[in-house]
Amino acid sequence: MHLKTILLTRPSGANKSLADLFRADGLSPIVRPLIELAEKPVDLEMKRIALNLDHYDKIIFVSKSSVRFGLPILENYWPQWPISLEWLSVGPGTAEALKQLGVVASFPDLAGSEGLLALEGLQEVAGKQILIVRGVGGRELLGQSLGESGASVTYLE
């Protein structure tokens, strides 16, 4: 019997659980990290966004990496988080990364942008200010959908 092969290109250290799942399904994963995550220096736009955190109604983290790189930028300017800010994440892994840093975030049962967009808290967003924390050039579905629903979307990337 010949196993089907799948190439995993996620950053180093991020492939093990996925490789294990594929192996359990009878696939033969090859791990070749082709992506390297690096911290982007804080620029004036990032600083402006961080300083205005209290102007946002909701903040969404799209990955564990967005927590790792984005949350410290915000923490530099906010020793205590704005009380009215609603925290959201795309799934349980990202929510857990936030929780380990003292932030409780809502997340959907179905992880991902589509699941997040189905949450009750994102159904009526017209006039809301939403900050999405993501990597440079991340997926557009979340921001586009929220914008089409009348929200004002800003990216911290």
Language-model segment annotations:
Residues M1-E157:
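Signature of uroporphyrinogen-III synthase
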